[in-house]
């Protein structure tokens, strides 16, 4: 159950959602058929977030193992199974990071990495902006760390 929850949290963070959005999700916000869920971001703005087939499998297993009736998607491991908090996720990620000799593991790094990977793979910046729930595209540009090799390839492709 613990391992399943960890995998689910890791998978959910790979969607690009904020940790604050993650902890607000309820079970019935999940649409397994469409592999998406509704999250409430900054300013309580609603948006859709998408997840892959692996995440769907992990989420279903996790929910099958749950015995509590809390509507929250992620809850504490012990009674009374209260909704997981932002600090709870952050502490757990730091612990997991230390286990594999990574310092300063933070949920926000998942968002930055996801933005960078999406752009590196050719996802249009406007779609990355929407995926991350940014109002301003400047915020998205600030998140993404541009790979110098990709700059070189793009230069050769477009300007040679």
Question: What would you call each of these model-derived segments?
Answer:
Residues 1-9:
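Single conserved hydrophobic/aromatic residue that forms the stacking wall/gate
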Residues 132, 137-157:
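Catalytic-site neighborhood detector that most strongly recognizes the C-terminal catalytic loop/helix
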Residues 18, 26-28, 124, 135-138:
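Short coil/turn motifs that cap or connect alpha-helices
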Residues 107-108, 143:
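Catalytic tyrosine of NAD(P)H-dependent dehydrogenase/reductases that use a Tyr as the general acid/base
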Residues 52-102:
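Active-site/catalytic core of tyrosine-dependent DNA strand-transfer enzymes
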Residues 15, 82-85, 113-116, 139-140:
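Ser/Thr-centric signal marking residues that sit
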Residues 15, 20, 24-61:
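Conserved tyrosine-mediated DNA breakage-rejoining catalytic core shared by Y-recombinases
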Residues 10, 14, 111-135:
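C-terminal catalytic core of tyrosine-transesterase DNA break-rejoin enzymes
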């Amino acid at each position: 159950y613990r391992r399943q929850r960890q995998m689910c949290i890791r998978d959910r963070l790979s969607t690009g959602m904020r940790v604050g959005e993650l902890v607000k999700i309820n079970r019935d916000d999940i649409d397994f058929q469409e592999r998406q869920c509704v999250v409430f971001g900054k300013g309580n703005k609603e948006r859709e977030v998408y997840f892959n087939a692996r995440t769907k499998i992990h989420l279903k297993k996790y929910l099958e193992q749950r015995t509590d009736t809390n509507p929250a998607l992620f809850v504490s491991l012990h009674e009374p199974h209260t909704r997981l908090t932002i600090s709870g996720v952050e502490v757990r990620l730091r612990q997991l990071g230390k286990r594999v000799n990574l310092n300063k593991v933070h949920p926000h790094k998942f968002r930055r990495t996801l933005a960078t990977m999406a752009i590196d793979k050719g996802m249009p910046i406007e779609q990355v902006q929407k995926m991350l729930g940014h109002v301003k595209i400047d915020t998205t540009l600030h998140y993404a760390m541009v790979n110098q090799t990709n700059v070189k390839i793009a230069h050769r492709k477009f300007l040679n």
